Amino acid sequence: MGKVESFELDHTKVKAPYVRLITVEEGQKGDKISNFDLRLVQPNENAIPTGGLHTIEHLLAGLLRDRIDGYIDCSPFGCRTGFHLLVWGTPSTTDVAKALKESLEEIRDNITWEDVPGTTIESCGNYRDHSLFSAKQWSRDILEKGISDDPFERHVVE
């Protein structure tokens, strides 16, 4: 079985919330895709409940797309502590952390239920499992700690 970088990471040494560049893959024609670890809560200490995580996922799909050129996808970790973010090119962890911070601020401060995309039976595979209340609470808690652009040393972005 191939090695998975995320499983090689010592989860006891990281300090969430943070943004970490996992890898940059280069295609046959030189195109680059960056994979980021958007870790919102400390591994093995907490996990975001599925309803809140699901709603954050749906909102980040649009909010990060508006803030990061080359956005491809943002998918939750199975452990429910954060997300993988895939983008074309090589944005800095600082730029990604700032975009994440702005997006979580938008969720915390401005988003209403009507703003949450994909909440119908036609548009979501598990449309009943959403919680804007939870998404707002978790966004608030994450922002209170600050988002670092370094996973091992706290360097909170403004």
Swiss-Prot record:
The keyword Aminoacyl-tRNA synthetase does not apply. It catalyses: S-(5-deoxy-D-ribos-5-yl)-L-homocysteine = (S)-4,5-dihydroxypentane-2,3-dione + L-homocysteine. Binds 1 Fe cation per subunit. Its cofactor is Fe cation. Homodimer. Involved in the synthesis of autoinducer 2 (AI-2) which is secreted by bacteria and is used to communicate both the cell density and the metabolic potential of the environment. The regulation of gene expression in response to changes in cell density is called quorum sensing. Catalyzes the transformation of S-ribosylhomocysteine (RHC) to homocysteine (HC) and 4,5-dihydroxy-2,3-pentadione (DPD). This is S-ribosylhomocysteine lyase.
